[in-house]
Structure formats: structure tokens, C-alpha cells
Amino acid sequence: MKRRTFIAGTTAATLSLTLSKSLRAMQEKAKKSKYLETMGLQLWTVRNQLEEDEAKTLKAVADAGYKQVEMGRVIGSESIFKKAKELGMGVTSSFVDWQSVLGIKGKHPELKAIVAQAKEWQLEHLVFGYIGKGHRETVDLVKKTAAKANEFGSMCNDAGIKLCYHNHSFEFKPVDGDTTGFDVLMAELDNEKCKFELDVFWAKIGGWDPIETMRKLNGRISQVHLKDLKEGAKIEFDESAVPKDAFEECGDGSIDMAEVMKVAEEVGAEQCHVEQDQSPGPIESMAQSFKHLNGLGS
């Protein structure tokens, strides 16, 4: 065989193999995500609408295509739970008061009451979704918070419920040198007692790549929050200082939602929920996000 012919053949074979791998990768990414079958909406997205007309708002959520809702609290959500179920939507997850988890004195629901109600409703997940100021600024404070979460996680486990921690962006701020609060949480939270509900928006605006973070948490993520971040948004650790227009509908921002759902499946996440904290039209926004996600891979 002539050298030129050999080189040409080798080059063609290499190119064919490369294209084949690229095509397989594209096909894998383009597949309909399994999460669409159970896609949820975190009801914080439509909090104001729920106060105005609970039944109408929940019907709009169901009509948009969502299969379940994630509640903002357990105690006090009896009406939402009942109406969501009547509309054929599932309710498998709910946030809990962070003050209750940390044992802060005040008019906060008791953990035993939260777990008892969650068990009666057959919830699968409870979400510890925030750490207030004064409980997150140092390594020791974050360790104490994680210890409280582990204690609550044991209580949840006894009831057949999984606890998970939902991040914002403050956790990604360094608390000791290069060590961030999130680093401490990853080290201190017992995976058997408290997993993560990773919010990809807050991770990214906190300076962490959502995909890399998900892979770093392989086997430790039970749920994922899907929300998009405006292209070019700056890192911001104070969630109250994030501009309202930084929150985008899924597909309109800088986060690759198809890749997020693909990697979520790879790392063992059980389900996903759309959430958009700020929007001039929450009903329209949540419907647009579902339409985009449902169109991926079609």
C-alpha cells in the first residue's frame, strides 16, 4: 500500500470514528429526559398568585404540564396539598422551616409535627433550604448547622423520608481561606442522613460550575432545582442583592438544561423541579420553562 493511500485511509477512519462518537454524544444528549415524567414546580415561583387564588394557580400549574409540585412548607399547606392531589399532581417534596431544623426559639413548627404530617402525606423528601445569618459565617458555625441537619436527617430516616439541603449562593463564599461554606457542608453532611437538592442557578451565580458540582456530588443529590441565569451575570454571594432580571426562564439563560438533566441522571438524582424566584409574569414563566424542557430531545 502506498504511504499516501495509507495516510488517507487512516485519516478517514479517524474522522469517521470521531464523528461517530460525536453523533452518539449528541443523540444521548437529545434523548427525552426521564425527569419530564415527574417534573415538578417549586411553588415559591407562584407564591403571590397562590395567595390571590390558590385553586386557579394550581390549575394553571397542572395545565402547563407539571406532574407534581414542591411545597414551601409542611405545616400550613394542607389546602395546597389537597388541591394539588385533586388536580392529579403528585406532592413528594416540601421545604421545612430552617429555624426549626436549627432549633431556634420562636414560633416555628416542631420537627416532630413536621415529620408526622409529612409521613401521613407520604412525602418522600423534606428540604432544609436555608441557613440564616449568624449560623453560616465561619467553619465552626457551618459545622454546627450540618450537625443539626444530620440529627434531623436521622428523624426523617426513621419515618422513611429523605432529607436534603438546598443551596443558595452564600454557601460558595469562602469562610476560611479558600474553603467555602459548601466545602464544609460536603464534608460534614452525612450522606445517609442528608443529601443535596442542588439549585443550578445559585451554584453558578456563586461561582461554581453546576455540571462540575453535580459530578462532585455523585451519589449525593436527591433532587435538582432548574432555573436559568442571565448571560453575563456577575458572581453574587448575597441572594438579596441579585438583580431580578438575573432570573431567566429555562432555555433563555446561560445554563445548558439538557446537560444538567443528563448529568443529574448520571449522578443518581431522583427528580427535578423548576423554580424561578423572580419574574414579571410567574404563570407565563413557569409555562415557558416547562415547554422548553419538554421540547428538549424532541
Regions found by a protein language model. Give the residues of each.
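Acidic/histidine-rich catalytic cores of soluble enzymes
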Residues: 158-254
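N-terminal export signals
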Residues: 5-25
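Hydrophobic faces of well-ordered beta-strands that scaffold small-molecule active sites
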Residues: 37-42, 69-71, 91-96, 126-128, ...
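C-terminal segment of N-terminal export signals and the immediately downstream linker at the start
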Residues: 21-56, 60-63
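Active-site acidic/histidine proton-transfer and metal-coordination neighborhood
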Residues: 11-12, 16, 101-195, 283
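Acidic (Asp/Glu)-rich catalytic clusters
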Residues: 29-35, 59-63, 77-93, 110-122, ...
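Acidic-and-aromatic substrate-binding clefts and catalytic sites of carbohydrate-active enzymes
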Residues: 47-51, 68-80, 98-109, 133-137, ...
